């Protein structure tokens, strides 16, 4: 299907044009930087999690097939991150006294309470990265809303804090509205524009 170019286009490709707003950062800074660590190990697709197959979307492997059984190499990639990689990153940020935002998948954080406590004790922000990895494109809106509520409840219970950031990662046409309806978020990282 080709879109009729004589009709109004539903996306804003113009934005501010030649007159973008200029942010006034604290202390006269000219740029703001946010360091983000995606913590997803234990939230990826895996038959152990009740999924039809193994993860294939995000991996160090090139174009892996999804297996309808345990994929030991794929599991190993995620296990390294949870068992070793994340601790190495935390030590480096702690050494430099740098703040970190963790995009935490709720089911992944549940599977590693020691790490979740470390994130909180080190003062790092934990933004909600959904319940688990699900492609929400064709999931009913009510299910997506229920998953958002469950993910936020898990984070609140585990950290004692309400997440101020949201990042689904595999969003749907409903996600942004659901985030706005849920309310209380300072930002939504599913939008990559300005």
Q: Residue ranges of each PLM-predicted region?
A:
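Catalytic alpha-helical scaffold of carbohydrate-active enzymes acting on polysaccharides/glycoconjugates
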Residues: 2-194
